[in-house]
From Swiss-Prot:
It comes from Escherichia coli (strain K12). PANTHER family: AUTOTRANSPORTER (PTHR35037:SF7), C-TERMINAL REGION OF AIDA-LIKE PROTEIN (PTHR35037). This is Putative uncharacterized protein YcgI. Gene3D superfamilies: Autotransporter beta-domain. The gene is ycgI. GO terms for cellular component: outer membrane. Pfam families: Autotransporter (PF03797).
Length: 147
């Protein structure tokens, strides 16, 4: 997979409340052949994605006792996908056109927490909906331990 991703953030009032404007663009090209264990296979000439995104994130930084910090945040963005002709052949049975082009809204909410100078974590949920595409609710969780 080849990916070029550019994201610019503009931070306003970074002390307690923070509003970040977000501009992103991406060009992605994925692999061409997939074979599943149930015998299904797909072949594509090229799977591409070119989009631009404009959004804003609002966060609130809370300093808790014992050196802990928590930062809940909300993000809303609009993404415009330009590629509309990703052709895929599934099981050698004709062509399928994977058209993900158009605008979609992206909505996310999460919380980041620093438990110590070396241990932190995050929890988040997201949803996306737009022309021809709906990404159902998803959740992410992670921890970071640095030493």
């Amino acid at each position: 997979m080849n990916t070029i991703h550019l994201r610019c953030l503009f931070r306003m009032n970074p002390l307690v409340w923070c509003l970040r404007a977000d501009v992103a663009a991406e060009l992605r090209s994925l692999r061409r052949y997939y074979h599943l264990s149930n015998g299904m296979e797909s072949k594509s000439v090229d799977t591409r994605s070119i989009y631009r995104e404009l959004g804003a994130t609002l966060s609130y930084n809370m300093r808790l006792g014992n050196g802990m910090e928590x930062e809940p945040w909300l993000k809303a963005a609009v993404r415009k996908e330009f590629v509309d002709d990703n052709r895929v052949k599934v099981n050698n049975d004709g062509n399928f056109v994977n058209d993900l082009s158009g605008r979609r809204g992206i909505y996310q909410a999460a919380i980041k927490a620093s438990f110590s100078s070396t241990f932190s974590g995050h929890l988040g949920v997201g949803y996306s909906h737009g022309a021809g595409v709906e990404s159902p609710w998803n959740a992410v969780a992670g921890v970071n331990w640095s030493f």
